[in-house]
Design a protein with these regions (language model features):
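Well-ordered beta-sheet/strand-loop patches within structured domains
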Residues: 17, 21, 27-29, 36-38, ...
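Short coil/turn segments at secondary-structure junctions
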Residues: 2-6, 47, 164-167
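Short, hydrophobic beta-strand segments
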Residues: 42-50
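Short, compositionally biased low-complexity segments
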Residues: 1, 31-42
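A cross-kingdom signal targeting lumenal/periplasmic-facing segments of multi-pass membrane
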Residues: 1-23
Length: 339
């Protein structure tokens, strides 16, 4: 008789059934870039993202070489292969939609403002929206106070607690320091030079909900400012985002990475001072016996942290940020008005 060698092959349908869940779990659509520039402000931006999928043909070829072609009579029961993942390029890349150097995320900062009163939440939302989409040119020093402009009821702000004249009082725009604090954190992480930064007079609980003490930045127009320099050689884009469920503010800074590496040290508390005893002040406008808290206790502390920025293994920025927080007294108004 004629001795014909057997012809081995895979059942294509069964192989496709096996590989389909694997492909579905790995597949990711590419994302086209979005960049809209109107009235000197970026109104919409999304960087392009590569997608990914698996190379089915390469998997089949590997299986053939590892099994049927190698030893058709002894297919291994347990065998592993590396899944070849290939990149899918978007049709519209970030480089195609702008020539300003806005390519990638170079720094991000976050903060929580849970337990804020309604007006404070409103002010944080308003102020952060007014910084959203700002472009900072190469070599430019960005001023938060200048960018926000007038902070008052005339520009849409509501009354919430501010630090003024050594007291915590209701004032227009209470909460805007949440915005400057969060942008400060983003600039720190981006490795940008901090030209001016001022701590708060006392430790504010909002800024320590998800952060150690000392990483805050106060602003108070016109003299207390946060200033950041763009030394990257390309434009940078500031974007803000609020998660309404978590009451979390995020600032993202986009630009062109030049490979700088940032190391931020853990804040160190070198001394602490207990808060003064609670003060009660008689108030004839409040019903007798009623208490109203108008200032909140906070221990004093001296805090510092360092930041080192390296590029090509050389230190290009070395800062120390120091905060001297005063001990703060809780104050209650005590009603004396007779019915």
């Amino acid at each position: 008789g004629i001795n014909l060698p057997p012809a081995y092959h895979y059942d294509e349908d069964k192989l496709a059934t096996v590989l389909r869940p694997l492909k579905d779990s790995i597949y990711k659509d590419p994302v086209d870039a979005l960049f809209t520039f109107e009235n000197n402000r970026v109104t919409a931006f999304k960087p392009s993202e590569n997608g990914q999928t698996i190379n089915i043909d390469q998997i089949k070829e590997t299986l053939l070489n590892r099994t049927i072609r190698a030893n058709p009579k002894a297919l291994p029961a347990n065998s592993t292969i590396t899944i070849p993942v290939v990149s899918l390029e978007p049709k519209i890349t970030t480089e195609k939609v702008n020539n300003l150097g806005i390519k990638e995320l170079i720094g991000t900062g976050t903060s929580l403002f849970q337990h804020s009163i309604e007006n404070r939440v409103y002010n944080v939302t308003l102020a952060s929206s007014r910084l959203n989409g700002i472009l900072v040119s190469p070599g430019e020093t960005f001023s938060v106070v200048k960018a926000l402009g007038d902070i008052s009821s005339l520009t849409g702000y509501k009354q919430a607690y501010v630090i003024s004249g050594g007291k915590t009082v209701l004032g227009d725009g209470g909460g805007v320091c949440q915005v400057s604090t969060t942008l400060f954190r983003a600039a720190l992480n981006a490795g940008l030079p901090i030209v001016e930064r001022n701590p708060h007079a006392y430790r504010v609980g909002y800024y320590e909900e998800d952060s150690p003490p000392g990483i805050d930045a106060a602003i108070y127009s016109p003299s207390v400012d946060l200033k950041i320099k763009n030394d990257t050689g390309h434009s940078i884009l500031i974007q803000s985002y609020i998660n309404p469920d978590e009451l979390r503010l995020t600032f993202n800074i986009y630009g062109t990475s030049d490979g700088r590496q940032v190391d931020i040290g853990t804040p160190v508390i070198t001394s602490q001072t207990p808060a003064p005893e609670t003060l009660y002040q008689d108030d004839p406008t409040l019903p007798k016996g009623q208490l109203k808290q108008v200032d909140f206790a906070a221990a004093g502390a001296r805090v510092y942290f360092t930041r080192t920025v390296k590029k090509d293994n050389k230190v290009i920025i070395a800062d120390t940020f120091t905060s001297n927080y005063r001990p703060w007294q809780a104050i209650y108004l005590r009603g004396t008005k007779e019915n």
